[in-house]
Amino acid sequence: MTLPVIYGELAPWFHLLTPPEHYEDDAAAVMGFLRERVEGRLETLLELGSGGGNTASHLRRDLRVTLTDLSRPMLDLSETINPGVEHLVGDMRTLRLGRTFDAVLIHDAICYMTSETDLRAAMTTAFEHLRPGGAAVLMPDHVRETLEPATDHGGEDDPPQADGRPGRGLRYLEWTTDPDPADSTYQVDYAVLVRHADGSVEVHHDRHVEGLFSRQTWLDLLAGVGFETWTAVDAYQRDVFIGRRPA
């Protein structure tokens, strides 16, 4: 899997694209789903596709977390806000750590599973890393029933430099489209401007191809792997899928 520019060359800028403090509500929602569905203790969590560690920076207040991602640069960034937390490079489709956890989280990184085969593989990884009674939370950005063309924009700045000049800055435009409604993908194009501390500015185009599946497909695949299944909706009206490994 080729890494998007945002997770490779631009990884050191990621917290200006999406700041960790914006993920406190997501983390609270994850904890709520887990407390409702995990049987027994809830102390450890494995995150697959943890990226810059934004959600984990809040979850680790309550849980002992292990973070995995395909991108070493993203894990390096995560370590700056999650010191002392275990960080491991790994592919959510094939990772096998040889141990189990009370919970598994796959946040929006699950969007990069663009076929049912890949999605099933990621779900199997989650199942294999759960103890009996443990639960997994999967949080795609879209399901087939909810995807609509959309645009978004944002970005943040670092604090000013010691001499008063602006620090680094980033701004982005995000454009979500579905070029072929008959297939299992949609695409998100980013136009990203980054301003270096010396004032120079670069422009990047980054296309993300992401998976799109119906709610029933999600539930059928989870059940096929062996999960007991539930659905929920988060504060942003996004579908959330929850699976528990039978005790």
PLM regions with names:
Residues 209-247:
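C-terminal lobe and adjacent flexible extensions of AdoMet/dcAdoMet transferase-like proteins
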Residues 1-43:
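Conserved class I S-adenosyl-L-methionine
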Residues 94-104:
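A short acidic, Gly/Pro-enriched loop at the edge of an enzyme's catalytic core
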Residues 120-132:
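A short glycine-rich, Lys/Arg-flanked "PGG" loop and its adjoining helix->strand segment in the class I
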Residues 44-46, 51-94:
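Class I SAM-dependent methyltransferase SAM/SAH-binding core
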Residues 38-39, 59, 130:
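A generic alpha-to-beta junction signature in SAM-dependent methyltransferases
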Residues 102-118:
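A short SAM/SAH-binding and catalytic strip from SAM-dependent methyltransferases
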Residues 137-217:
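SAM-dependent methyltransferase
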